[in-house]
């Protein structure tokens, strides 16, 4: 557990300048992601640790939304899901994801509104991709909308990225500051509760580091 983690974890951040959400490569993301990448972006140890972590969050019968998905969703195979919906940028990658029951192509940097009704999902995941969002608060507001009451959003990340497509804030921050940044997204989205961060794989290990930031939709 990171030292600043708690059930009342606060990012400690105020407003973030808009320039920190710019990218080195400002060309259309659709061009960059047109070529399928059927590779894993974290090592096998981090993948298994993430799957084990998801297993703790999930119940049989849950509906899952995998945002910024690819050809793997890292969900535990032994669980039964009522639905696993994926959103991504490359059709071939999503077609190769055997865990998805349905998917759609959407560039969240161009259009943040999700094509789902209110309160459809028990869990929303964003795995090793949050660093590419240029309008993250708007996306997190949509996540809140589509989550069921008591639903959870889990954002995971490592130290890997496509530097030209990651926002400036991600490139200049480090692991624990990345946690604060993602917590700030949850805070600015307005209604999330129980924001927590955890380091699942140490940056001092011989494996890829892995962090998660989670928050719940708790109606008060």
Say what each PLM segment does.
Residues 190-191, 199-220:
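Core SAM-dependent methyltransferase catalytic element
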Residues 49-114:
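Class I SAM-dependent methyltransferase SAM/SAH-binding core
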Residues 122-137:
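A short SAM/SAH-binding and catalytic strip from SAM-dependent methyltransferases
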Residues 152-184:
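Conserved class I S-adenosyl-L-methionine
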